Design a protein with these regions (language model features):
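Active-site-flanking beta-strand signature of metal-NTP-handling nucleotidyl enzymes
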Residues: 1-3, 56
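"Short basic amphipathic alpha-helical interaction patches in structured regions
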Residues: 13-20, 49-51, 66-68
Length: 142
């Protein structure tokens, strides 16, 4: 799941996500699918995000709805360093689109801790507890 800038058009959001996915997966012959998600009607209206699904098994399109699927996985790309590179590449893609959109914001792949920010990690509430919190009910978390 990739957080996107809510001020951008859907085209800009999709373009940023597609360029990132092509750089990280497509150029290695790996398939990917992108879905842009609008914020939940009851949630934060800034929560535009993309879901990206990929595989480490290379695929080549050989016809309409027809793919040649490799037998071997790209295990060389499935490691902690590659996960960090995914984050770094997305930060660069977000920064590039920010400049194109005239915002000139710089995005980073660094965690809050690595940036020296005193922010405690929060617990994921899940759908049921989020619904309770939004309705004004007390939820013992964060």
């Amino acid at each position: 799941v990739l957080a996107l800038d809510y001020r951008w058009s859907n085209e800009q959001q999709f373009q940023t996500t597609r360029e990132w996915a092509e750089e990280c997966f497509g150029k290695h012959g790996l398939p990917y699918a992108i879905a842009l998600h609008a914020p939940d009607p009851d949630g934060d209206p800034r929560n535009w995000h993309a879901h990206v699904m990929s595989s480490y098994r290379p695929m080549t399109r050989v016809g309409p709805n027809e793919w040649e699927v490799a037998e071997a996985l790209r295990t060389d790309l499935d490691n902690p360093r590659s996960m960090q590179l995914l984050r770094e590449n997305f930060a660069r893609a977000m920064t590039r689109m920010s400049r194109e959109a005239g915002q000139c914001e710089r995005h980073t792949a660094l965690s809050h801790a690595a940036r020296g920010l005193p922010v405690e990690p929060q617990q994921h509430l899940g759908e049921a507890r989020t619904r309770k919190a939004r309705s004004g009910e007390y939820v013992a978390a964060n």
